[in-house]
Design a protein with these regions (language model features):
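Bacterial N-terminal signal peptides that target proteins for export
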Residues: 1-12
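Bacterial N-terminal signal peptides
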Residues: 11-20
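Sec-dependent signal peptide cleavage junction
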Residues: 19-33, 509-510
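Terminal, non-catalytic domain-edge segments
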Residues: 27-47, 297-300, 315-362, 500-504, ...
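Long, well-ordered core segments of solenoidal/helical folds
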Residues: 34-62, 90-112, 137-160, 188-210, ...
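An alpha-helical repeat/solenoid feature that recognizes helix-turn-helix modules
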Residues: 60-90, 111-136, 157-192, 205-241, ...
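Short, tandemly repeated low-complexity microdomains enriched for cysteine and small residues
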Residues: 91-96, 136-143, 186, 192, ...
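Beta-rich interaction/scaffold domains
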Residues: 355-496, 500-516
């Protein structure tokens, strides 16, 4: 009887253990975000960014304020993610402003950036995601970012500079050329094999990569994996390097599922790891190497989410645009993997029969009406519209009234360029005159007053495009110096009154003494 009882108890315990295990698996599976949930996280990040640029939920994402950042880190990763999320939005104005900013950089320095090749690579990816062509940029389509940023990347002296940023330049160069499987042109300074070899040769002895030193850096290791992923199944040395890197990342993962850089858990590092795992097709929710104490990297990333939908770079921290954009890219990578689409940086069409995006639509009767309706006095709010119309015009061979449209649009562009130049100069001169702020004195009053007069000469709309810090500091400096001047004038006035009183007293005393010294007259 006892034996039967013990057997029953044993069977019951096994069943309970089995059921408990089943509950654990169900809970873990239930924590996997759905495609819709991932889209909601991404949308919340985008809405937070819109609010930062003064847009309401019903406004377009690409308003004039945001488009002023096109060509910067903050201005390119959001459009890239929007494109990779396949969100319906107008891309023409972003491409037009970005192309114009690139042309301005080339006209000024002859290059996009003389020291950072990764500037080219980021813009290449953003342009592709938005439906543009990074090999034909500009009104005359003469700028080739692949040529100048990868194949023949040199600094102003003509020295090869793809590796000037260390392994980072090679990593992002590889991501750029593999985004559409571009082939190196004849006579290229760098080839695909050369770049790949540079990345592999930078691997650390224990696995992984770093910009410097001998300790693997989570972000750089994750990005290297992203770049090497396309070669994993065709080259054994690449597969081995990736496997070592994955093991290293697993070792570096924090106990709560997150990842740290410089001893601090942060959103950027965990985002890069998630992108790397998705690029390899590794499920971050079930792969035991990347689940610590029941927490996944995704769980850790979501701890940085704020109530307004944005993300901080440290738990309990404030909103951080860089952390938000990296999280947005990670969420996009997860969304694409869950939907069976190409990985984040593979920008070839998901459907081979898909109609390619057209960067700029035709300049038609509606475009002509828009052109003729432009006001005489323009502001930077009109810049995206003017540039879009110009690029539409350049992309359309036969346009009725082309000369009229060109005259109006080129004149409008010249007016807008003059505003941009004045804002850039004003910003630069404010920095030169006002800082260090504590050293300001009345000798600077004339310069500060002149700067303020230029600020006042701007339209209210254009003033909004001056950085908040420059505008605030200019107003503060003016108020501070006016207060000092007022105090000085009051002090001088009081001093003058005192002096006049003293002179009056002295004169009066001397007058009385003279009167006392005069002899009395005889009568």
């Amino acid at each position: 009887m006892r034996r039967v009882l013990r057997s029953c108890i044993s069977i019951l315990l096994v069943l309970l253990l089995f059921l408990q295990t089943g509950v654990i698996f169900a809970r873990a599976e239930s924590e996997r975000p759905s495609s819709k949930e991932l889209q909601s996280v991404a949308t919340a990040i985008l809405e937070r960014k819109k609010a930062e640029h003064g847009a309401t939920p019903t406004d377009l994402f690409f308003n004039a304020s945001f488009l002023q950042t096109a060509g910067s880190t903050a201005g390119d990763w959001y459009p890239f993610a929007i494109g990779r999320l396949a969100l319906e939005t107008s891309t023409e104005e972003y491409l037009a402003v970005l192309y114009d900013n690139i042309e301005k950089a080339y006209h000024k320095d002859g290059v996009l950036d003389a020291t950072k090749a990764t500037e080219y690579h980021r813009m290449i990816l953003a342009i592709l995601a938005m439906g543009g062509d990074p090999t034909h940029v500009g009104i005359d389509r003469s700028i080739d970012l692949l040529r100048d940023g990868v194949w023949n990347c040199v600094d102003k002296s003509g020295t090869p500079s793809l590796g000037k940023q260390g392994v980072n330049g090679y990593i992002w160069g590889l991501l750029a050329i593999d985004s559409m499987q571009y082939e190196a042109p004849d006579g290229a300074m760098y080839t695909r094999d050369m770049i790949l070899s540079e990345v592999l040769s930078a691997e650390l002895p224990r696995g992984g990569w770093a910009l410097s030193g001998s300790v693997a850096d989570v972000d750089v290791t994750a990005m290297a994996i992203q770049a090497l992923a396309p070669y994993r199944d065709v080259r054994a040395d690449v597969k081995d390097a990736i496997d070592r890197a994955l093991n290293r990342l697993s070792e570096l993962q924090d106990a709560d599922g997150g990842f740290s850089a410089w001893g601090r858990s942060n959103a950027g590092s965990v985002s890069q790891v998630l992108i790397a795992l998705c690029t390899l097709g590794i499920d971050p929710f079930t792969d035991a190497r990347f689940v610590k104490n029941g927490s996944t990297a995704y769980d850790a990333m979501m701890r940085f989410q704020l109530q307004d939908g944005g993300f901080s770079d440290s738990v309990g921290g404030s909103y951080n645009s860089r952390a938000s954009e990296q999280t947005l890219c990670a969420v996009t990578a997860l969304w694409r993997m869950q939907n069976g689409m190409r990985c984040l940086y593979d920008l070839r069409p998901d459907d081979l029969g898909e109609t390619p995006k057209v960067a700029f639509s035709a300049f038609d009767a509606k475009s002509m009406a828009e052109t003729r309706a432009l006001p005489t006095e323009l502001t930077l709010e009109h810049r995206p519209t003017v540039l879009r119309l110009l690029y539409q015009l350049s992309a359309t061979p036969d346009v009725s009234g082309r000369e009229e449209a060109e005259r109006i649009l080129l004149s409008a562009k010249a007016q807008i360029d003059a505003i941009i130049l004045e804002l850039e100069r004003l910003e630069s001169e404010i920095a030169a005159v006002l800082y260090p702020f504590d050293a300001l004195n009345l000798r600077d009053y004339g310069e500060v007053k002149a700067l303020y007069q230029r600020y006042e000469a701007l339209s209210v709309s254009n003033r909004a495009f001056l950085s908040d810090s420059a505008a605030e500091d200019l107003l503060r400096a003016k108020a501070q110096l006016q207060t000092e001047l007022r105090a000085t004038l009051i002090g001088a006035g009081c001093g003058l009154v005192v002096l006049c009183l003293l002179l009056y007293i002295v004169f009066h005393i001397r007058h009385r003494r003279r009167a006392q010294q005069l002899p009395e007259s005889d009568e």
